[in-house]
Amino acid sequence: MNEIKLSQFEGADDRERFAAALSYMRERPGMTLFVEPGEYVITTPLARETMNNAITGKFGTNPEDVMFKPDFRYDRGLDFSGHISSRIIADGVTLMIDGFMEPVSVRDCSGVEIVGLTIDHVRKPYTKGRIISWTTLDRDENTAEILVDFPENFPINPDIIYPRYCTYVPDKERFGKDFGIRSFTYIDDHRARFVLERSDKSFVGNELYLWHSFHSRPAILIENAKDTVLRDVTIHSQPGMGIVGQKAENILIERLRVIPSVGDHISTNTDATHFASCRGLLRLDGCEFEGQGDDSINVHTYYYTVISHEGERCRLQIKAPTGTHAQSLDYPEIGDKLELTDKKTLLSVGEYRVVDCRPDFEGFFCDVVLDRALPDDLDDYFIADPDELPVLEFVNCRARNHYARSILIKCRSALIENCTVSDVFECAVKIAAEAWWHEGISTADVTVRRCRFINCGRRLTECGGVYVRMDCEDSTTKAHGLVTIECPEAHHGIVVKNTKQAIVRRNHIVSAKQNCCIEPGVEVL
């Protein structure tokens, strides 16, 4: 019998019952777990302590500085490590997470499929209130004082932190314009006064949201996993990203929804999905994104820094500002092709093969043997691993009202098709390697077609539609390969830079500024 039910397993709480079922399945590849519909509370003392410490400022005014570190202690909810061909059917099932943790870990496994699961939090990783009064303080300084009422399920405290905040405008069904908070005065658990900067009109009736974290653990981690499938999964909240994929191969995600729960307007505190150093096919089909604090999707590998080398031997380390997004070691595989990359232009200037690789998980570096010697002076170069990039298919998806860009592409091959993006703060699609973040690499063949981009680029950005560029020191570099853009409705323009070849056709563009800008030197086919 290859089918079991969660109700067959006992435990002191819901987390222990899931652990018992998953332990049973770990020893029996090919099992299917049916979870009866309902709410299941997943919690631990550490998760609750972490949440309280973060919200009350014990981790500082930005908890990411403490929580987004390799040595930070955290608990997991459902752990699929060691599983082979396991399925969990969880239609109508909600995991109510009490605290800050990693709710689902799909790691060191193969063939795991999750269907129908919803993830939410007992106490959201943000606080919501309603602005009930507005008083102008100084018209010249553009300051005002607001009184905010917080409901029973969002109590505040005198030490509450808010590394990010925003308003939601019900009449427009989107986040409001940027402003600053100069001071916070606690009245009681459900009322507070704030003095605002850059505030030129009344916000009365708007919702005020206070984030309590940026990056920490994701709602779902997919790491060192092969052939993972997520279907009809919903993520309503997480004190970090929704899904993080790291060193995973072949990921299929269908009808994912990273959206706020009913009555709220924030979903994940940062990226909805983020995939780093993955392989094979990465396909997202029919997914929906709304209210997250960063991109809908970001796909990239990392630029390694050579910290020492002699002949064909080298020691590589990722020196991204915040480390890897799983806070675990990234390293090339034996047989991978590596590219020597100019830091200023992000152009590949040489190719090598990995003969041997020995990762040091404690030191967070890897010792690599190449098929030939590296140049003597490597201060001006990165090492990139293009084999640690998937082919991306992002199709039939919708995204609206969220921060940052929506679709961020740093992989060699990608198809963005039949997608609608509206009311995002920056551009709908950005195709760009980013040297400062140590995230790459340049693309070879990216197609954006049959998409609609409406009212994007709400912040002062160069482009709100499709933005092709390289974020590096040399602004004249031509590192991208072929980019094809065919969209029937691309409000707010198309900008193509740093690209060898471009096909831009059959686009209907309505822009407040320049409709389409293709810099000199780009071959238009």
What are these regions (language model features)?
Residues M1-F18:
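Right-handed parallel beta-helix/beta-solenoid
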Residues D14-R15, A19-E36, Y40-L525:
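Extracellular parallel beta-helix/beta-solenoid repeat domains
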